[in-house]
Amino acid sequence: MDKSSKPTIRLLFATKGCAISHSLLLLTGQISTEPLYVVSYTWTPDLDDVFVKNGREEITQVIPTKRPREVTENDEENQIMHLFCSRDVNVIFYLIGGFSTGDVRSRVWPIFFCCFKTQTDFKALYKALWYGAPLNPHIISDTLCISETFDIHSEVIQTLMVTTHHLNRKGLSDNGLCITEATLCKLVKKSVGRQELTSLYAHYERQVLAAYRRLYWGYGCSPFWYIVRFGPSEKTLVLATRYYLLQTDTSYNTLETPLYDLQAIKDLFLTYQVPALPNCSGYNISDLLSFDKLSMFCCSSTYTRGLTAKNALSYILQRIHTDTTEIHAVSEYITNDRKGLKVPDREFVDYIYLAHFECFNRKQIADHLQAVTYSDFVNKPVLLKSSNLGKRATANFFNHVRSRLNMRDYIKKNVICDVTELGPEIGHKYTITKTYTLSLTYAAKPSKFIGVCDLATTLTRRVENIEKQFSPYGWSSTIPSNPPGFDELSNFEDSVVSAEALRAANFANDTPNQSGRTGFDTSPGITKLLLFFSAATGIATHDVSILSYKTPLEALIGHSEVTGPMPVYRVALPQGAQAFAVIANDTWSSITNRYTLPHEARLIAEDLKQINPCNFVAASLRDMQLTLLLSTSVKNVSKISSNIPKDQLYINRNELFNTNLIITNLILDVDFHIRKPIPLGILHAGMRAFRHGILTAMQLLFPKAVVNPNKDPCYFYKTACPEPTVEVLDDDNLLDITSHSDIDFYIENGELYTCVEENYTEDVWFFDTQTTSEVHTHADVSNNENLHETLPCNCKEKIGFRVCVPIPNPYALVGSSTLKGFAQILQQAVLLEREFVEYIGPYLRDFSFIDTGVYSHGHSLRLPFFSKVTTTGTAVGQLLPFYVVPEQCIDILAFVTSHRNPANFHFHSRPQSNVPVQFILHNLGGEYAEFFERKVARNKQIFSPPQISLTKALKERGVTCLDAFTLEAFVDSTILESIVEHIAVHFPGRDREYTLTSSKCIAIKRDWVLFQLICGTKGFTCLRYPHRGGRTAPRTFVSLRVDHHNRLCISLAQQCFATKCDSNRMHTIFTLEVPNYPNLTSS
């Protein structure tokens, strides 16, 4: 019978001296004086009758002693010896070590292969395995299988023969350094054994010892090493040692069970809670200072043999399978959701962390560990489906996430619409008073210009004079005196700061700074003044002898018999200057008539009507054809900006968003950040799906309106590409600090403005019209069915769109937050459109493409047909129509013409139908947006320690009153000195700028307070980069807040105007902890 098929015991041993030296003596035919001690062992299943049925569980009498028990010829021993002697048993002896090459990382390596046959040998083996008795080296020598043993060592011996030059010199090459291939082949075929090893050991003892010590690198491990690595309990010492060293396959090529590290194995055995008898050796873990005691302790343990030992292996394999199954369930959900859950990158990162947290938070882990704990002594462990970890996570989290993958379920489960119904009469009056006059945005025929357009400073003086004239007749102050931007960020319901404290903060900000202006003037900026004027009903005086105009709005416009509301525009002038306009009547035809299809193009457009609108590809190519026809017909478009506001008004115009009015047109600012250029056919196909997603969402959100996604219009405008080297002035990055700083001051002085439209200078589209016109003007659409073969769009990094969707009658929206939420819902609706993801998805860098920052009071958005202004005064990046014709469009030319109607691309246009507004959508509730952030916040509230309030943290430091004066005094006296010290250490030479600094309170909220630092010298310099040239000094702020660890912290941040510093983006420089004593420590 083949020896490899015999019953086998794998045995890990140790010696008191050097195990390598003693082993080499045995391998070379000598007898060592040092006995061998069994540390751990395992057996093949055909020896279960020996080790399981006669294990420690069958022993009923336990006699604790600190010496080995006398082994007598009792029934137990006779029974075991009978079972042993009925067969030959292979015993393979191991030492810690082995090769580490490729994917194989051995933990133990065999050194002896023995075959036990006689009763004397079995008796010695029985004493060693059952009671830890020393194993005499004579037994190893007598039972050693020479052939099998030296098969283990053949490679080592051959290598040693080569390295020690133990070869015939004729086999060497001429230089005596390299061995020929023929010699190596001869050497490999040569059988090596004890004779060769003995010769090597006799002549090269040092080299042989070194080689074997490198192979069996654990030869010097002490008993303490085993205790530290596998202890400290008896269960882990015995079971973990056996599993980790003898029962784990460490070859990654053949690995089926995941390879866990030692600590993980020890942790897994903690839930294997089978009752065990006391160790009959009488030793404790602390007594195991020698290998004889370690061997007695391990071999006498209940965990060494019997059902406890046999079931341990089955349990650990099932436990690993159960754990990995639950983990893989989460991975599978994430992998599947990765394909279908199209969300912005930040939300997807939150989703990944939340998915794991929902499965592996403390409660879930505790329940899982309880479910997989095994304490049955008799039955084989069965852990399959014992844990519901993945199921609970699915019910609590993944099902909710999956609801975001279906538009109907997404809106039904995540969106709550707060709608107020108006009566017919009230609705009619509400529509008239809260929308622009119809003629203001009507472009059917030429009309003269009636309005005012001038620089901000001029308009400010004009408004002040008008207020002085009308104030005796009841004209009230235009805007409440909150700090600029405070009304947009403060949550009054959550705020714990009193109104008196806010007024004190406002009063504290009236102190002039070095520029002559107050740090944060409480008077409203020009944008809010104009928005208030244009929307307010105001008063009217009929005493013409006293005043020339009846209302302040008439006085502002300089024309009688005009009524509001009126649109307010921002106009970007060359060199960064700004102008504003309030218009009662305009010559829109002079703007839009430039963008009409020529007569020849009209005939071609008529031919395009024959295309089947249900053919998605053909319809997309038809839309591309119409867009190209328009692009080739545009003429006489000025590319030179003007310094005269009224002239520049027809080159650059941005509508200011007015929260005092209702929204009748949904204007979306869309920016696709792309990986590579998109073919125009693909782009048109993707935008058809974009349109369908928006209108489908509106159909669900407005149940009492008639919305037909296949028929209702949706107007697209695409930004033309400027020259690659052009730098755009009105770079519309939204500032982080707009709501905490005096932005209006910078607007009026032309130093800063945030329009929040396109975020980069590399605007979009506009390919070479000379090339495309020749190729596509008379193209046969039916012959070009491959959208990927169309010409690519020339934009390299970003594609910008303005998408205008009329709110269906009889609905209207109110409020900035409502519109922001609505835009977020529509973005999710677009991402749920399969065609959009299929066509556009592969080209997108991320899935956050609708900018909601434009929907803030006083922010502006560039209108279609207008351009941006560059630093050189050039007008670039026009917003031109990008046609997406509805499937059921009856008159294509009428649809094309409607793109030029200003009533379709203003936020607050009056509905063109006679149906008054009856339903006002004023709030969107539910978890339609920021679901992951809200989930994180709830989990943090449940599992994190209670968060102390800012008020409590300040009271611990002696600040009992939360008013601006007290907070400023606290910062000036306690914090600024330490900030200066920190700057002196980390920013040498800059501390002089902060020596005469004082703080000004800007905003007080429930959980943070913001201050601006006022420099008493020439001003601050940027702490991030050493900018060249005379640049406006950056603004420096400090914020006071409590972090997640309940530490009161102060953060210093700067807002630098340099492009290298992201053009006014707020950047935190450092954060310090505020302890209960004056000196701060770095956080």
Swiss-Prot record:
Q: Which GO terms describe its molecular function?
A: DNA-directed RNA polymerase activity; zinc ion binding
Zinc fingers (CHC2-type) by residue: 1022-1061
- The EC number(s) attached to this protein equal 2.7.7.-
| Keyword set, alphabetical order | DNA replication, Host nucleus, Metal-binding, Transferase, Zinc, Zinc-finger
Name where it's found: Host nucleus
The site annotation (Essential for primase activity) covers: 669, 671
Q: State any GO BP term from the record.
A: DNA replication
Q: What is its main location?
A: host cell
Q: What's any one GO cellular component for it? A: host cell nucleus
User: Keyword Transport, does the record have it?
Assistant: no
Q: Does the keyword Ion transport apply?
A: no
How it assembles, according to the record, is: Associates with the helicase and the primase-associated factor to form the helicase-primase factor.
The UniProt family comment states: Belongs to the herpesviridae DNA primase family.
Q: Which HAMAP family match?
A: HSV_PRIM
Q: What does this protein do?
A: Essential component of the helicase/primase complex. Unwinds the DNA at the replication forks and generates single-stranded DNA for both leading and lagging strand synthesis. The primase initiates primer synthesis and thereby produces large amount of short RNA primers on the lagging strand that the polymerase elongates using dNTPs.
Q: What's the protein here called?
A: DNA primase
